[in-house]
Amino acid sequence: MVEAAARKGVTIEVVTFDESTHTAAEAAHALGAELGQIVKSLVFVSGGADDLEPILCLVSGVNRVDLARLAAVCGLPDVRRATAREADELTGFTIGGIPPIGHIRRLRVIMDPDLGRYEVVWAAAGLPTAVFPVPPATLRVLADANVAPIAEVTAAPSPGGGRSVVVEPASAPGRPATGTTG
């Protein structure tokens, strides 16, 4: 993974921990960072067993991927979350340590625009106990990612009570940054 970054002219500094950074919450706690600064590297697939099309989503730790939005962004009829075995076979890494780069095969990469709200984000570095800091613009280049809105849109309680309002992810045009999901 470090070599993959070096091939693109970027030096990354891997930070390791004794404790797990397997989940976004664990990583944020270990780093003393905001949950939104943690890059979740999530593998999705489309197609059948013989022709799986893998998609890697780089998602802010506060967001969840909306499958319908992801399918629409990718121009696919449907997508589903890859199994742990599929993710390992497609990337060469186990869930909880999947980095945004350095996979055993080329993947289509979609990046959550909410990551751009931060000066630096933290991505997995190949192990559930290792991460690396990277500016979002550099991450996009390293991963050869397309930036697209793939986060869920949720219903939040109305401040007045009773009725609910639709809350878009922070990156949606005209929406405040407080509307992200966890």
Predicted regions and their residues:
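Extended, low-hydrophobicity, polar/charged segments
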Residues: M1-G182
